[in-house]
Amino acid sequence: MKFTKMHGLGNDYIYVDAISQKIENPNEISKFVSDRHFGIGSDGLVLILPSDVADFKMRMFNSDGSEAEMCGNAIRCVGKFVYDKKMTDKSTISIETLAGIKVLEMTVENGKVVLVKVDMGEPILKAETIPVLSEKHPVIDEEITAKDYCYNFTCVSMGNPHAITYIENVEEFPLEKIGPLFEVHEKFPKKTNVEFVELIDDSTVKMRVWERGAGETLACGTGACAVLTASVLKGYVGRKATVKLLGGDLIIEWNEKDNHIYMTGPATTVFEGEIDI
């Protein structure tokens, strides 16, 4: 299997052209290649496939083998993958995902993609669609308790569920202890990604994320979009803000005209190779 390892702000996946090669049992392959000791090492596997409704189709799998709807960092890399490999000559393309069709605008320098702006679509605020068990609409400051920990969560879906809460010091927060408790909380029928956010100023927030099925990662694009949405809903920031993640910064904008969230950030190729599976 030929592959390319890429990352968006350190959120790394193994990318495979599944148009020119047949990939069977991607769930197991993802578990294998993701292993940082016995595999290649990544947060998961991304397949680029043909699409009947868009330029390309993306399927992505977490390091535990589960399939995910969408990943903002991964989709930026998909744009770079197909452009840099001359699978397309368009700098604006559409990608089919389980969370719908996403449109990417790519900034190209010297024939290579350096930045990708993604139309992430409208944030979903309806409790049953997120899904979260709540009577509120939108779900702002829903008090949720797990063991001895209690937080007020604002819940948003960007095609995948996110629960966002605000804390004083995100760097020193014991995420690996508390994140998993809320990821699998009964309030979230499909589990959830959990974001802990520190407010820096009215145009900057800093976050750490516990990703559903992957644990803490250096960055989560849909998480950054959900955090911006929650922060606007709570009146903390304006409609355009810098979201600081462990792996770097994303610029997120909630456009008032079309109600869509736009995410701009880098995409980086690490190396290419071939592996027996």
From Swiss-Prot:
The active site is at C71, C220. It comes from the Archaea. It is found in: Cytoplasm. It is an enzyme of class 5 (isomerase). One of its GO terms (biological process) is lysine biosynthetic process via diaminopimelate. It catalyses: (2S,6S)-2,6-diaminopimelate = meso-2,6-diaminopimelate. Keywords: Amino-acid biosynthesis, Cytoplasm, Isomerase, Lysine biosynthesis. Gene3D superfamilies: Diaminopimelate Epimerase, Chain A, domain 1 (3.10.310.10). Pathway: Amino-acid biosynthesis; L-lysine biosynthesis via DAP pathway; DL-2,6-diaminopimelate from LL-2,6-diaminopimelate: step 1/1. Its EC number is 5.1.1.7. Catalyzes the stereoinversion of LL-2,6-diaminopimelate (L,L-DAP) to meso-diaminopimelate (meso-DAP), a precursor of L-lysine. Belongs to the diaminopimelate epimerase family. This is Diaminopimelate epimerase. The lineage of its organism: Archaea, Methanobacteriati, Methanobacteriota, Methanomada group, Methanococci.
